[in-house]
Structure formats: structure tokens, C-alpha cells
């Protein structure tokens, strides 16, 4: 069993005079993590699947690595946030000149009129392609159902016709029976007398000399036999219906969206909203602790503001943030999902207390999703996410307030108001729903969709990365040019590719990105193994370059660090 100890090293390293911590084993071997900031130090914490280094976090966290302690600390912090606090005062962005000027930027109706004919023409073309795919899909399904009917008919005969005939015959015998011996409910009624044709019927005729009473008993016996046969035929009919339903459920490719469907209406509204470049998109992703879903570990935010993208540019400008909650810092997922909280690809991750995380998020929401000026009110606003309703519920549990009509948190999941949005309407744009309404449920995870449309990605299940990829995926879903080049409207072709990937997933091993912590650990082992071997080659560590984690005492300080220094 290895015993570990913390060693404080105050040695100078060039111009970096910051204190750093080093975790060593008894044999002196172990990775060294130096602070790259001017903060007073960094705490390296040994975790189940790697060492986590946080620049600027110097307080003693002894014992907090225990799961129960971290969970308790998070839940206690969440309980304290349930007390009333003034969310409206989270508005530091309105104190920064750059963001003040953005609020004075109005949506251009002239540009909107120029874009509209192009969007209308594309949607008309999209309708035709979806209808064609829908027609082909339905024709294939009907052919398969007809084949099931034919095979069933060869074995069982025409069950439906047999059942209809038998039910009609039973109905006739029931009328005869009720006429001979009227039931109590019909004794007061005047029933039609039996005719010669009734008595000579081919189902259960009355022989000459047979009394009505005996004939009644014969009819009852005949009806009893019919009841058994009818039940048998009904069972066979139900089995046929079940088999056809099974064919419908398992049929591939099943296209649901066509030009008159609710699915297509949702797709069209999303595309029109985004292609008009009217919508300010606030994308969210939450990562929770796998053994206690009440505990949030990471929050990722990516924002696309069309006001920052009005000047023609080849690259869309987005604002990206990755927040790690201090109380749950040491909680690492590993059993069900990979933990990549220290693998943020878009810069530094900010370690904040739960309270300051809430202030950070609320400040962004209050700026981007709550209009203040008249120019502000000319823009639409939307939450974006992959199954975003779950992320919104998580944020509600920690006290984040969402805008809507009357600022009461009424969010529009249906896009019914997308064509005539009000000042306070906030739409819900969901990449999972968009995909499913287009291509069905198979392959609807974020990673599989990104892979399907050849969108580069890595280190999913880092909340910051997921938010960024989700936002860009939705923008590509609604980008007319990307849809044309990628063939997104050839629904059957896309669904065929989904099937191919599904078959490959069964045959091939799952590819999982290697955490840089593991890379460093392997490098240390290699150095130990090669000890004493001289080499002119400089030692290398194979890893992805990340921005690392930095601790901030307040949300405002964390946000201020993102602003340009000039």
C-alpha cells in the first residue's frame, strides 16, 4: 500500500514565483503540477481516476474527498440558496460599456426582408423532400403489412370475414331466441312474430314437430358454441393486430415528419427562427454526480448573440464558460460515464462555490434573456440544449430564476409563438427533439449525432464542451447551406447512415478519449522504467492541451477575468 504526502516547494522557476504543491509516493516518484497563474498556490487532490489541480485554491480540504462529505457540503449549500435573495441585482454586465452598447443594437428589419425569400424558397424545397421521403417510407411499410396479412391469410384464412359472418349469424339467433322467450327487459315490448323464413333458417332451423321450447334450447346451445368460436377468432384477430403493430414499431426507416405534420412544423419554426439570425441562444449543459443525481458537479454555458455577429465573418463568435462547483469538486464519475471535468477545450474552467455559480448564471440570464431597452425587445431569445428540460430543472433546484411572460418562468417549448414573439418570450430549442422529429429515436445521443454529421468533437461529458457542441450542432441543424451540403433533407439516406453506425457500434469497440491525467500517469511509469537509460531525445507527454482549473472567490471576479485587458 502506497502512502502519499504533500510536499510544499517554494523554489523559483524562472519568473513564476508562485507556490506549488507536489504529491509524492514513498519512493519519491509522482507527477508534479505547477501553478501557471500568479495566484498564491494550487491544491492538487488525489482522485479515483487522476490528480485534479486547481490554481488559486489554497484552503485546507482535508477529508473533503470523501463522497459523503462532498454530497453533504453540496446539499447544505443548496439549502442555503433556498432562502430569498435579490436575483435582479445580478447585473454586472450592464455595468460594462461593451455590453451596454450591445443592448442598443436593434434587429435589422431590412436584412430580415432580404433573407426571407431565400428562407421561404429553402423551406418549400425542404417540404418536397420530406414529403417524398415520407411517401416512400409509408409505401414500404404498407407493403410489409400487406405481406404479413397475406402470410397470415394463407395459414389462418380470412379471420376478419369469418368473424363478421359469425357475429351476424349470432345476432340473428339472438333475435330468434328473444322472440321465442323474451328476456325480462323486453317483455313489455311488442316483438315481431316469427315468420316461416325465420323458422326455416339455415343456421338453426326448427324441424317439423319440434316445439318452440325445444327449438329455443337448440338455439341456446348453438349460440354457446358460436361464442367459443367467436372468442377464438377474436384472439386470432388480436394476434394479427399485435404482429402488425410490432412491424410498425420495428419498421425502419419510419419517417414521421411531412409537410402537414406537427413534427415538420417544429423543424420549420426552428429553422426560420435561427436562419433569420434573430435569436439570442443561451445553451446549457449540466453534469451531475452519477450516484446522487441531486448533486451538480459542472455547468457549461455557450452563448450565441447575433448582435456580436452582425459584421460579416467566416467564424461565428460565441461566449463559452465552464463552471465547476467547489463543494462537489472531488466527486468524480467513473462507473456509468467518463469524468472529464478537467478536460475543458475552450479555455480555463472556473471553480466557484455553489452560491457564486448561481450568481454567475443568473447574471448571464438577466443580461441575455431579459430585454431592457427598446432595441433589446426587437430580438428573440432561446434556451438551447440536448434534452434541455432536464438541465433547466437542475438549475431550478439551486435557485436560478428563468424569464418568461411576466418573469414567472413560463418558457415556450412548442414554438407556437415563434412567428410573432413577445418581448418576454423565451423559446426552448432542443437538439434531441430536432433530431428525433427528423430521423427518429435511433442514434439520438449528442455524440452519435455529432459523429453522424461529421462534426469534430472530443471529451464529451465535460459540461463546457457539451454546451459548446450542442450550440454548434443546433446552429448547423438550422443553417440552410450546411443542411444542403450535408444532405440533411434526404431523410431516408440519413436514416440509412444511422443504421450503418448502429451496426458498427454493435461490432466495434467503443472509442473513449484518454484523459490527460492518465497520459501523465503513463508517462511517469515510462520515466521510471527508463531510469538510467541515456537519451538525447527530449521527454514528451502525449496529451491534449487544456486551460486548467482556476479558483475564484466571487462570480464577478470569474466573469471579469474573461474580459479583454485592453
UniProtKB/Swiss-Prot annotation:
SUPFAM superfamilies (UniProt xref): Ribonuclease H-like (SSF53098)
Record PANTHER family: GOOD FOR FULL DBP5 ACTIVITY PROTEIN 2
Protein name per UniProt: Good for full DBP5 activity protein 2
Annotated TM spans: none
Highest taxon listed in the record's lineage: Eukaryota
MF annotations from Gene Ontology: nucleic acid binding
InterPro entries listed in its UniProt record: Gfd2/YDR514C-like, Gfd2/YDR514C-like_C, RNaseH-like_sf, RNaseH_sf
Biased composition (Polar residues): 1-16
General function of this protein: High-copy suppressor of DBP5 mutation.
Segments of this protein annotated with the region Disordered: 1-41
